[in-house]
Swiss-Prot record:
Described purpose of this protein according to its UniProt entry: Channel that opens in response to stretch forces in the membrane lipid bilayer. May participate in the regulation of osmotic pressure changes within the cell.
Biological classification of the source: Bacteria, Pseudomonadati, Pseudomonadota, Gammaproteobacteria, Enterobacterales
UniProt record similarity statement: Belongs to the MscL family.
Pfam family, one: MscL
Predominant location: membrane
Name the record gives this protein: Large-conductance mechanosensitive channel
Native source species: Pectobacterium carotovorum subsp. carotovorum (strain PC1)
InterPro entries named among the record's database cross-references: Mechanosensitive_channel_CS, MS_channel, MSC/AndL, MscL_channel
PANTHER family reported for this sequence: LARGE-CONDUCTANCE MECHANOSENSITIVE CHANNEL, MECHANOSENSITIVE CHANNEL MSCL
Length: 137
C-alpha cells in the first residue's frame, strides 16, 4: 500500500476529521476570547484600579544600548493570557458539562419496549383461544 493511500485513509477517518474541525473552531474561539479579554474586560478592570493598561506592565531587564534593543519582560501580556486561559477553560468546562447532562438525559430515557415478533403474536392468539375454550366456573 502506498504511503499516500495510507495517509488518505488515516486522514479521512471520522476521528481525525472531527479533531481537525475541533482545532479550527478552537482557534477561532481563542481569537474571540482574546479579543473579549483585551478589548472588553481588561480596559474597565484597568480603569477600576486607576486607569492602568495591563498590556503596558513590563520589567526592563536591560536598557537599550545603541542599536541593541532593550530586554523587556512583558508580564502585563502574561496577565492577559492568564485571563484568556481562565475564560477559555471555563467555557470548555461549561460546554462539556452541558454535553454530559444531555448524554445522561438520553441514557436515562427508557428504551421503547420491542414490538412482539410474529411468533409471539401467534402464541398470544393461541393462548387467548385456549382461554376461551376452557369451561367457566
Amino acid at each position: 500500500m502506498s504511503i499516500i493511500k495510507e495517509f488518505r485513509e488515516f486522514a479521512m477517518r471520522g476521528n481525525v476529521v472531527d479533531l481537525a474541525v475541533g482545532v479550527i473552531i478552537g482557534a477561532a474561539f481563542g481569537k474571540i476570547v482574546s479579543s473579549l479579554v483585551s478589548d472588553i474586560i481588561m480596559p474597565p478592570l484597568g480603569l477600576l484600579i486607576g486607569g492602568v493598561d495591563f498590556k503596558q506592565f513590563s520589567l526592563i531587564l536591560r536598557d537599550a544600548q545603541g542599536e541593541v534593543p532593550a530586554v523587556v519582560m512583558n508580564y502585563g501580556a502574561f496577565i492577559q493570557n492568564i485571563f484568556d486561559f481562565v475564560i477559555v477553560a471555563f467555557a470548555i468546562f461549561m460546554a462539556i458539562k452541558l454535553m454530559n447532562k444531555l448524554r445522561r438525559k438520553q441514557e436515562d430515557e427508557p428504551a421503547a419496549p420491542p414490538k412482539p415478533s410474529a411468533e409471539e403474536k401467534l402464541l398470544a392468539e393461541i393462548r387467548d383461544l385456549l382461554k376461551e375454550q376452557q369451561p367457566k366456573q
